[in-house]
């Protein structure tokens, strides 16, 4: 995931831990910086669609960050309906959902950053975090 964004010119921070003293308080899957946006990444590769846990984990991590920080959850086998409902009703709306098929499509087209911009635009204009990149020629 991170490498695809890096190839297209985004600055990335590879997975890291946040520590207080000697204790790890967070494990971050990565961060992306592009076009004035700062994004925290949570990536899951479960056999089944991801449930609410990755979303709630990322939401807790975002609560400790500047308000403009956006989160992105990548789930290679999609999301359960409860996960999508939760993400749609978060306040503030700051977590974008990426399904595996969308990521594969964006990588094949070398348009991962364009996909991010389409998802951000939809979230701002429509208020939903789960825009499907298969809906148009973004």
State the predicted function of each range.
Residues 1-138:
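Mixed-charge (Asp/Glu-Lys/Arg
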């Amino acid at each position: 995931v991170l490498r695809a964004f890096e190839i297209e010119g985004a600055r990335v921070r590879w997975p890291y831990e946040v520590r207080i003293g000697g204790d790890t308080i967070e494990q971050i899957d990565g961060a992306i910086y592009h076009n004035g946006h700062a994004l925290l990444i949570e990536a899951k590769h479960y056999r089944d669609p991801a449930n609410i846990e990755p979303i709630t984990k990322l939401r807790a991590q975002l609560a400790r960050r500047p308000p403009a920080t956006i989160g992105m959850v990548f789930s290679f086998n999609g999301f359960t309906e409860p996960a999508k409902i939760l993400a749609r009703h978060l306040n503030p709306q700051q977590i974008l959902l990426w399904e595996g098929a969308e990521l594969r499509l964006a990588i094949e087209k070398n348009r991962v950053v364009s996909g991010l911009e389409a998802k951000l635009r939809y979230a701002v204009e429509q208020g939903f975090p789960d825009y499907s990149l298969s809906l148009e020629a973004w």
